[in-house]
Amino acid sequence: MFCCLGYEWLSGGCKTWHSAWVINTLADHHHRGTDFGGSPWLRIIIAFPRSYKVVLTLWTVYLWLSFLKTIFQSENGHDVSTDVQQRARRSNRRRQEGLRSICMHTKKRVSSFPGNKIGLKDVITLRRHVETKGRAKIRKMKVTTKINHHDKINGKRKTAKKQKLSVKECEHAEKERQVSEAEENGKLDMKEIHTYMKMFQRAQELRRRAEDYHKCKIPPSARKALCNWVRMAAAEHRHSSGLPYWPYLTAETLKNRMGHQPPPPTQQHSITDNSLSLKTPPECLLTPLPPSADDNLKTPPECLLTPLPPSAPPSADDNLKTPPLATQEAEAEKPPKPKRWRAAEMESPPEPKRRRAAEVESPPEPKRRRAAEVEPSSPEPKRRRLSKLRTGHCTQA
């Protein structure tokens, strides 16, 4: 009891700087022990010895309390080490004694220890500072809300304008893209049309050439005489009319070329001229006239049937597809092949037409007559009554 009072007198009653320093140092530097015992109690007990019995009693109580404390801590599952617990209690005690704060005037950290307590002026200043800070925060919130609202409205307007502009730009870009695509398509179409026109013109040219070739085509039976006639005419003219010395000219080509030029003048040739054969009769030296439309080229004069010496090779400027003379002669000697008739061209006997059953004429069937309509072949005897027979019999008698 005396020890407890002494502790109260040291800690609370006489709160001097020296006593607080002694207690704090004892609490900081003591070793492992319990709250009920330890170095502070031991020093108090040693500092106030009265009698030997009191010392023994206190010592016995100290041991029993330490033993019971140790047992209770082990049963509750607490950690045996009390250094951490004591430090935690000491920090809580200091926190309860006073708060650490900042002085508004000096802007320095104020300790909460008993020697450095916060004054009334600092408390008032701190309160005003908190109020000012709260008002500033509220003002800032209001201003921020107003600015945000204003920006929101303006932002919507600007967004609408931007959207309209973007829509117009998109439409303009889309129109430009469509125009460019149409131009590209038009160019491709024109190119394709040009290609088809070339193909069509080429086909027309080939068709015209084929028609000309078939028009100028002569049967093999008339080629030999015609070629002799053409060679004779070329030799007679001596290229005076501009005709090339080519014996394979067709009748149509010769006719066309000689028809546009005037007839050449008559020329006399000597017998020593190598261009004509000595076997050629003098009647054939007459200048032939250009053939007319009614001339029969298939029947040339007899003097033209005489063969002539071989002529010069054909020139490169004439592109006429007439076979050579040897081929013509070989074809002329061959007998003409019989013409093949197609199945559609063959005349077949007319097939009898099929008639329907309704169209076929059948003999008329005899009509059935009724029994009343049929005329009897021999008249049947009429039956007489008995009264008439009796009367007649009586009369005869």
UniProtKB/Swiss-Prot annotation:
Record field: compositional bias (Polar residues): 267-277
Compartments (UniProt record): Nucleus
Tagged with keyword Nucleus: yes
Region Disordered, residue ranges: 256-397
Organism: Homo sapiens (Human)
Record keywords: Nucleus
Identification of the protein by name: Nuclear pore complex-interacting protein family member B2
UniProt biased composition (Basic residues): 382-391
The organism's place on the tree of life at top rank: Eukaryota
Gene: NPIPB2
